[in-house]
Amino acid sequence: MTNSNLRTENHFDYVKITLASPDRVMEWGQRTLPNGQVVGEVTKPETINYRTLKPEMDGLFCEKIFGPSKDWECHCGKYKRVRHRGIVCERCGVEVTESRVRRHRMGFIKLAAPVSHVWYLKGIPSYVAILLDMPLRDVEQIVYFNCYVVLDPGDHKDLKYKQLLTEDEWLEIEDEIYAEDSEIENEPVVGIGAEALKQLLEDLTLDEVAEQLREEINGSKGQKRAKLIKRLRVIDNFIATNARPEWMVLDVIPVIPPDLRPMVQLDGGRFATSDLNDLYRRVINRNNRLARLQEILAPEIIVRNEKRMLQEAVDALIDNGRRGRTVVGANNRPLKSLSDIIEGKQGRFRQNLLGKRVDYSGRSVIVVGPKLKMHQCGLPKEMAIELFQPFVIHRLIRQNIVNNIKAAKKLIQRADDEVMQVLQEVIEGHPILLNRAPTLHRLGIQAFEPKLVDGRAIQLHPLVCPAFNADFDGDQMAVHVPLAIEAQTEARMLMLASNNILSPATGEPIITPSQDMVLGSYYLTALQPGASKPDFGDRSCTFAGLEDVIHAFEDNRIGLHDWVWVRFNGEVQDDEELDAPSKSESLSDGTRIEEWSYRRDRFDEDGALISRYILTTVGRVVMNHTIIDAVAAA
């Protein structure tokens, strides 16, 4: 038993893009119905009937070709409901199935005359011109009906294979051939348009040409050799992919599924449609007109003009504006062709396939978070609850706060204190990734420990800004949540901001203080010119430890740049270390006091240090105390 809803996994090694043969293009769009009828060819330019709003049969939205527009319902309405699955309606010929088949079922247009593919003709390099070993200008003259090309010189002594002839030149040769005294028995054959191009490409025997080119390459050098190698490379690629050169000339055009070029009704009763429908309509109209002209044996000049117009219509469909005048729609806007949909920044590959939105991600503006540690970032509660929702739901159920997922989601929507408590537990030790586009080197995406913050902006430590090339003038950053334990471990071990201090490019530190940080550090440690230094023992300016200085500063008893005497048990390095003290005094208890400009030491009888006071500013005490705390915490 097969079920269309089941996905079958096909494992493959690679995807190969090659030229499609006309038979392959017809295979894509052609289907045989159970009643034996073959469908797939789009023959009418109509889209929908504006009275019934149903797709026209054999048109660009035909339900017989592409499938029903409503689930389990045929065009005429005879069959409705899923129980008729797979039945083909006898009246309208529509298969009863799901409407989503209209996203992948293709059709085709059988052309009344071959047309050249504009990519291979006008691309850089032009593969048609390289294969035929002709200048691109000459090939264009043939394709767009400006010149004839000699396909077979026959017995004519002045003609050569692939020689170009103007209209007048060919008329003269015709007069010569059909003259009564003509000695030409084997008449020369000439062609024009994509048909002639197809004939020239069919005449190429790739293996023989490749062999001949290899021999010529051995005996040539310089520019000529480079040109021969270029041609040989193209021919070898054709041989390797089993593609024929004449497939670059189209006999059949695929019609992409209708749901990929939709037509939607607007509020006022008007319709908005994809540009592709207009381009396909032009091709079908011109193709039908050409077929009718050929049927009634119209004059050659009229048929030729119609063939040229068909060529231009197909060019516009494949790549509008590549050659000739750009086809425009309403208000002179160029119509978007198949190439425009694929290529560029907004194209299918870069926008939709490479630039997909992923689950468990979000983005917001960044603001500075000076109180954060370097490996932390501030994550808005609103974002965190959304990103970590599955983890929160799991924990709520496990802790018996709720019984099911539905109840958990309701609780989360209310943002109760219980939920916030659980969220705090969930994010504890769960790193997140921050990315700033463009990610030009590996430090453009780093891991951080999230801290819940109010507001809607992500808080970032200022020291990691150089790595991201970020500033706080409106930059946005993306957040990603690593889900697997392996991913979380890797993020913590390899990607944590505090583990990425050196630049991978130069090996120099990339985490360097700048701007406000440098200015703040300078201001904190600067000496105020002309400030008076207190005497040792002045109770308002002498302190027993660094903490006492900071408490006095916080209580506004002293200013940031005031001089203070503070007891300090650590090592002190200064320029006066080697000089003799400015004052040395022995006390009655056997101890000795030595004084320098910025230091006062007291030693016991054995010369061991009892106490040390240093003269410094409050700002320098704050700086030193902060560094000691940070080192101790690490």
Swiss-Prot record:
<keyword id="KW-0804">Transcription</keyword>
<keyword id="KW-0548">Nucleotidyltransferase</keyword>
<feature type="binding site">
    <location>
        <position position="475"/>
    </location>
    <ligand>
        <name>Mg(2+)</name>
    </ligand>
</feature>
<feature type="binding site">
    <location>
        <position position="76"/>
    </location>
    <ligand>
        <name>Zn(2+)</name>
    </ligand>
</feature>
<dbReference type="Pfam" id="PF04983">
    <property type="entry name" value="RNA_pol_Rpb1_3"/>
</dbReference>
<feature type="binding site">
    <location>
        <position position="473"/>
    </location>
    <ligand>
        <name>Mg(2+)</name>
    </ligand>
</feature>
<feature type="binding site">
    <location>
        <position position="89"/>
    </location>
    <ligand>
        <name>Zn(2+)</name>
    </ligand>
</feature>
<dbReference type="InterPro" id="IPR006592">
    <property type="entry name" value="RNA_pol_N"/>
</dbReference>
<dbReference type="InterPro" id="IPR044893">
    <property type="entry name" value="RNA_pol_Rpb1_clamp_domain"/>
</dbReference>
<keyword id="KW-0479">Metal-binding</keyword>
<dbReference type="GO" id="GO:0006351">
    <property type="term" value="P:DNA-templated transcription"/>
</dbReference>
<keyword id="KW-0808">Transferase</keyword>
<feature type="binding site">
    <location>
        <position position="74"/>
    </location>
    <ligand>
        <name>Zn(2+)</name>
    </ligand>
</feature>
<dbReference type="InterPro" id="IPR012755">
    <property type="entry name" value="DNA-dir_RpoC1_gamma"/>
</dbReference>
<dbReference type="GO" id="GO:0003677">
    <property type="term" value="F:DNA binding"/>
</dbReference>
<keyword id="KW-0460">Magnesium</keyword>
<keyword id="KW-0862">Zinc</keyword>
<protein>
    <recommendedName>
        <fullName>DNA-directed RNA polymerase subunit gamma</fullName>
        <ecNumber>2.7.7.6</ecNumber>
    </recommendedName>
</protein>
<dbReference type="InterPro" id="IPR007066">
    <property type="entry name" value="RNA_pol_Rpb1_3"/>
</dbReference>
<dbReference type="InterPro" id="IPR042102">
    <property type="entry name" value="RNA_pol_Rpb1_3_sf"/>
</dbReference>
<comment type="function">
    <text>DNA-dependent RNA polymerase catalyzes the transcription of DNA into RNA using the four ribonucleoside triphosphates as substrates.</text>
</comment>
<dbReference type="Pfam" id="PF04997">
    <property type="entry name" value="RNA_pol_Rpb1_1"/>
</dbReference>
<dbReference type="InterPro" id="IPR034678">
    <property type="entry name" value="RNApol_RpoC1"/>
</dbReference>
<dbReference type="GO" id="GO:0000287">
    <property type="term" value="F:magnesium ion binding"/>
</dbReference>
<feature type="binding site">
    <location>
        <position position="92"/>
    </location>
    <ligand>
        <name>Zn(2+)</name>
    </ligand>
</feature>
<dbReference type="InterPro" id="IPR045867">
    <property type="entry name" value="DNA-dir_RpoC_beta_prime"/>
</dbReference>
<dbReference type="Pfam" id="PF00623">
    <property type="entry name" value="RNA_pol_Rpb1_2"/>
</dbReference>
<dbReference type="InterPro" id="IPR000722">
    <property type="entry name" value="RNA_pol_asu"/>
</dbReference>
<comment type="similarity">
    <text>Belongs to the RNA polymerase beta' chain family. RpoC1 subfamily.</text>
</comment>
<keyword id="KW-0240">DNA-directed RNA polymerase</keyword>
<comment type="subunit">
    <text>In cyanobacteria the RNAP catalytic core is composed of 2 alpha, 1 beta, 1 beta', 1 gamma and 1 omega subunit. When a sigma factor is associated with the core the holoenzyme is formed, which can initiate transcription.</text>
</comment>
<dbReference type="InterPro" id="IPR007080">
    <property type="entry name" value="RNA_pol_Rpb1_1"/>
</dbReference>
<dbReference type="GO" id="GO:0008270">
    <property type="term" value="F:zinc ion binding"/>
</dbReference>
<dbReference type="GO" id="GO:0000428">
    <property type="term" value="C:DNA-directed RNA polymerase complex"/>
</dbReference>
<feature type="binding site">
    <location>
        <position position="471"/>
    </location>
    <ligand>
        <name>Mg(2+)</name>
    </ligand>
</feature>
<dbReference type="GO" id="GO:0003899">
    <property type="term" value="F:DNA-directed RNA polymerase activity"/>
</dbReference>
